[in-house]
Amino acid sequence: MLLLELKKTNQTLETIHFIGIGGVGMSGIAEILHNLGYKVQGSDLSENYNTKRLEAYGIKIFVGHTPQNITNVSYVVVSSAINRNNPEVKEALERKIPIIRRAEMLAELMRLKCSVAVSGSHGKTTTTSLVACLFEAAGLHPTVINGGIINNRSTNAYLGSSNYLIAEADESDATFISIPSTIAIITNIDPEHLDYYKDFDTLINAFRSFITNLPFYGFAVCCIDHKIVRELVNNITERKVITYGIDSDDAHITAFNISTDITSSTFDVKISLPNVSGVTIIEKITIPTPGRHNILNSLAAISVGVELDFGIKAIKNGFNSFKGVKRRFTKVAEYNQASVIDDYAHHPEEIKATLSTAKNIANKQHGKVIAIFQPHRYSRMQHLFDDFMRCFDDADLLYITDVYAAGESHIEGISGQSLIDNIIKLKYHNQANFLAKLDDSLEVIMNKASPGDMIIMMGAGNISNFANELPQKFGNLS
């Protein structure tokens, strides 16, 4: 980045091209570079919220991938989703244009900052947003690069005025190990991305490196309610680790006196830091989002705030300012006094957490939970097939669509229909149904929704687009 800064200063501005710029991770980095004064452009297969947002900022966007898109570029940035058969990658290789991985570019942005990297199988995006809110409330105004749209800002990335940078660290291909962070957060570790890691032990070892690569003056924040994280922390002695949890009495930071309602959670916090005498209690912290998993995400942010001495007022004010993250239990529509929720859950553990929250709310409203799930990636479904069969207990009615491939080839025997067939055969759910088309969800909602119901539309594919179009569809029915 120093060389790029020199070239920028000397008025020899070079173009950085992002292949797949509409991806949530890529768009954030592109936006930060643009805001720093670099010349940025990019391409994607289709327009989406992110490409339109970047275009409004003056960033040139190409729809479709062709060699002509990189005619006058000096650097090409790719994510792990872009392979070498991409025509723009082929052109870059042919012309010997440097190809930079997304994680490498993120690392360069973080290198000269005091950086907080948030990783884990689930909860990264919300935790990143919560940490950012606490930094803002403490007057530190960080640069933020997130994996989801932060409702406070209507963007997934923004440039701050301080020397702090907070980033979501994607563990999917082990590149998060190379991120030069000062503070590392691990929310949980579950068997995920095994198409890359091949086995769970390799994934766990990557998280170990994520902590041990910290500088000696840095620290990690880890949730020891999670068995695998606890085992990992117990075997790390060379770096400072702050632990948190709800069920773990031995955690440094714990939540108790928990109460929840439909839109928020309130709890007290007990703080007992290593090498610090005495116990501190923070009473009545409120977060404007429901769910036990979000209390855990909040404890991660509190752990950072306590260690950096933000103060109780800043911590409470930070949470009060939090407005949530797009596609994290987001209400998008209402039909027959039933709420339609759009949620990113696509892993069995995420599905359990989302449905548990929905069940708690539905019970208070004397309603039921209707789950409509779109599986994401054949490889994920293959690796976690048994877990997917067992994760829908809190749904009163279950509907599963076919798999959103996300560019993957079909795997024999892996489909939405096969998942439903096995759920029924093994009696994991007695109200499970297959939806041949996502459009059939509209009929399900119209026929099944009752007052007080929670209709949860889950997945990392295009089910979100469908969910967000429902208000218009309902309007057309009236």
From Swiss-Prot:
GO cellular component: a single term: cytoplasm
Enzyme Commission code(s) on record: 6.3.2.8
Keyword Cell inner membrane included in the entry's annotation: no
Keywords, alphabetical: ATP-binding, Cell cycle, Cell division, Cell shape, Cell wall biogenesis/degradation, Cytoplasm, Ligase, Nucleotide-binding, Peptidoglycan synthesis
Functional pathway: Cell wall biogenesis; peptidoglycan biosynthesis
Gene3D superfamilies hit by this protein: Mur ligase, C-terminal domain, Mur-like, catalytic domain, NAD(P)-binding Rossmann-like Domain
Group of enzyme by EC: ligase
Major localization class: cytoplasm
Gene Ontology MF terms in the entry: ATP binding; UDP-N-acetylmuramate-L-alanine ligase activity
Keyword Cell division: yes
Catalyzed chemical reaction(s): UDP-N-acetyl-alpha-D-muramate + L-alanine + ATP = UDP-N-acetyl-alpha-D-muramoyl-L-alanine + ADP + phosphate + H(+)
Binding site for ATP: G120, S121, H122, G123, K124, T125, T126
Residue stretches in coiled coil: none
GO BP of this protein: cell division; cell wall organization; peptidoglycan biosynthetic process; regulation of cell shape
One Pfam family from the record: Mur_ligase
Subcellular location as annotated: Cytoplasm
Role this protein plays: Cell wall formation.
Name under which the protein is recorded: UDP-N-acetylmuramate--L-alanine ligase
Organism: Rickettsia bellii (strain OSU 85-389)
